[in-house]
Amino acid sequence: PNRVVAQAVIQNPRITEQEVEKIAAMRTVPNDVLRQIAINRQFARNYSIMLNLARNPRTPIGNVVSILSRLQLRDLLNLTKDRNVSEAVRKQALRLVNARTGGKG
């Protein structure tokens, strides 16, 4: 999708959280749009949106790292095994798993 159009869609006040959830999961969305979703407080309250952003390899790493601390343990474990996300994201997810489980994860 065109970046300008995608950014306009995200800024539309009538967009639903379900629509944003689907956009956050799309791998063709420009990373600027994913960054915009990640820093939006309204969308940050929705766990599914945050999880989709964390799983999306196009989400900027800085945004993903701040999201990881809010994810549940089982989702972090899945991220440590996900070859679609960057190595840095997998390592940070593993650090958080180890911190929460006392190093047993």
Task: Report residues per predicted region.
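Alpha-helical scaffold segments
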Residues: 1-105
